Design a protein with these regions (language model features):
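N-terminal binding-site loop/beta-alpha segment at the start of enzyme catalytic domains
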Residues: 1-82, 202-203, 269, 286-289
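Acidic-and-aromatic substrate-binding clefts and catalytic sites of carbohydrate-active enzymes
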Residues: 32-35, 55-63, 91-96, 124-127, ...
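Short, acidic/polar
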Residues: 33-45, 94-109, 156-159, 180-181
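Short, well-ordered amphipathic alpha-helices
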Residues: 62-72, 102-106, 136, 158
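Short acidic capping loops at alpha-helix termini that bridge into adjacent secondary structure
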Residues: 76-82, 112-116, 146-147, 168-171, ...
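A short, structured active-site edge motif that brings together acidic residues
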Residues: 78-92, 115-122, 176
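CE4/NodB-like, metal-dependent polysaccharide N-deacetylase domain
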Residues: 98-119, 138-142, 164
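Beta/alpha (TIM)-barrel catalytic core signal, keyed to glycine-rich beta->alpha loops juxtaposed to Asp/Glu
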Residues: 122-289
Length: 289
């Protein structure tokens, strides 16, 4: 199910607690090299994406920047239509180091500001998020980073950040998919007005085969792909999603989620797939240096 060029107006915005709004569907660029990411971002922009999710740790910010510049989305009126996220390397957490790292990211991206700057991992075993957040606030106050977020923060991390800074992030980006729904984390975020953003929204494709054909049966009923079913489930949950694809046709498919809706029974069947199936890393122990 694809309609060629997707009207960006079809993709809803999620209102954030800081007054900004983020397109609910974006393109993730993890594990794409610096040269390869250029045509990937260019094709996504052509398909109608208005949200690009990157990170310093992906080692491709320069390529993303070249794609934005080549497409005219790095400045002017077109820039104002685009949401660009990047993330701080864990090794550069801290007040002065975060400010320096941000300047480098901005230069590589060829931008005057980013729409969201995020702490990539909480590293509770080497907690520096409090000082880092103070640097983030300076960047926000200076108009350099419009929204501040975190990734992979568990409730204990969010509580600690709030206790030590008085602030809740606007967004928490976590691993989230049908077989790893993290309901406790999601509930905590909703309680405190934190928008939830899902990376690996399909468990890197593994969830397509979950539940003895559950996803495939729903896809057949709607004449869409299994991937679209999973992404539609996220949309109906109010989750921001950043599926990755290097293929233009798949990028279009991943954006084409608004011509069908799941029934209550179908949605419940996907809810029932929840289980202990993490596709990524444990935030209690992992660092993305």
């Amino acid at each position: 199910m694809t309609n060629g060029h997707i009207n960006p107006a079809n993709v809803p915005d999620i209102a954030l607690k800081d007054g900004h709004s983020i397109p609910q569907v974006g393109l993730g660029v993890l594990r794409i090299d610096d040269e390869g990411v250029v045509p990937v971002v260019e094709s996504a922009l052509e398909a109608g994406y208005r949200h690009i999710d990157g990170a310093a740790g992906y080692n491709n910010e320069a390529g993303v920047g070249r794609a934005l510049a080549a497409s005219g989305y790095n400045k002017g009126a077109k820039r104002e239509t685009l949401w660009v996220t990047t993330k701080l390397r864990d090794s550069q957490q801290g007040y002065d180091s975060a400010l320096k790292a941000f300047d480098n990211s901005l230069e590589l991206l060829q931008l005057d500001y980013v729409d969201m700057y995020m702490i990539h991992w909480p590293t509770p075993f080497d907690w520096r998020s409090t000082d880092t957040w103070k640097a983030f606030v300076k960047l926000r106050d200076e108009g350099m980073a419009r929204t501040l977020g975190v990734c992979n923060f568990m409730p204990a991390d969010l509580k600690r950040l709030h206790e030590e800074t008085g602030a809740w992030p606007a967004v928490n980006q976590i691993e989230l998919h049908p077989t790893w729904q993290q309901r406790e984390v999601v509930a905590f975020c909703k309680e405190h007005g934190i928008a939830v953003e899902a990376y690996s929204p399909m468990a890197r494709g593994a969830d397509i085969n979950a539940g003895d054909g559950t996803i495939e049966k729903i896809a057949a009923a709607h004449e869409v792909s299994p991937a679209q079913v999973i992404l539609r489930w996220h949309i109906e949950n109010g989750t921001i999603i950043i599926p990755k694809s290097v293929h233009a046709d798949r990028q279009k498919e991943n954006l084409d989620l608004f011509g069908f809706a799941l029934t209550a029974d179908e949605h419940a069947a996907i809810d029932a797939l929840d289980g202990p199936t993490r596709a990524g890393h444990d935030p209690l122990t992992f660092t993305y240096a």
